[in-house]
Design a protein with these regions (language model features):
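C-terminal segment of classical bacterial N-terminal signal peptides
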Residues: 14-23
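Bacterial N-terminal signal peptides that target proteins for export
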Residues: 1-8
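Mature extracytoplasmic or otherwise solvent-exposed domains
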Residues: 24-169
Length: 169
């Protein structure tokens, strides 16, 4: 029962982090010459709601026949302790799990890259506890903190660095 209360509080804390703005950088030096956001389009905006990160779509013009790869990685980091049967804390832990979605976007006939909305969901406390094992099977794991972070990148074929990078929170 205590574990469920802690999980509920941690879920609220994760939601509170959603108000933190993401850091976005567009560098069209890492794109085909002439690449630009099409009129009416802008840099994608990523938002965190609960465990899910959603990044808006965009359209990039002037890319010729160059395709791009979009990655969205959501990392859930859990801190906590393992407790023995006597109630003593015996082993602290910090573990991270990353969920990644990858899409290859093909340029259109007129040299535009239409990037759809991207979404990925991090690992919940319940999912983490279902698979995490303390070093001793007789110990019980308790989560005391959770954080969510994400990294969105759009990298053009033939380039080693992303043209768009968004990280948060």
């Amino acid at each position: 029962m205590r574990k469920l209360g802690i999980i509920a509080v941690l879920s609220l804390l994760v939601t509170a982090f959603a108000a933190v703005p993401a850091l976005a950088v567009t560098n069209f030096d890492n794109a085909p010459s002439g690449a630009h956001y099409r009129t009416g389009s802008a840099e994608p905006v990523c938002t965190l709601s609960g465990l899910t990160v959603t990044c808006t779509g965009t359209t990039i013009g002037g890319v010729g026949n160059t395709n791009a790869t979009v990655n969205l990685a959501v990392t859930s980091t859990f801190t906590g302790t393992c407790t023995n049967r006597g109630g003593h804390l015996v082993e602290p832990f910090t573990e991270s799990e990353t969920t990644t979605t990858t899409s290859v976007i093909t340029s259109t006939r007129n040299g535009q890259l239409i990037v759809p909305e991207q979404s990925a969901t991090g690992t919940s406390s319940e999912e983490f506890l279902a698979t995490f094992e303390c070093p001793n099977p007789n110990w019980t794991a308790t989560i005391s903190g959770t954080s969510i972070s994400f990294l969105y990148t759009l990298t053009f074929a033939g380039f080693t660095e992303p043209a768009i990078t968004i990280s948060g929170p």
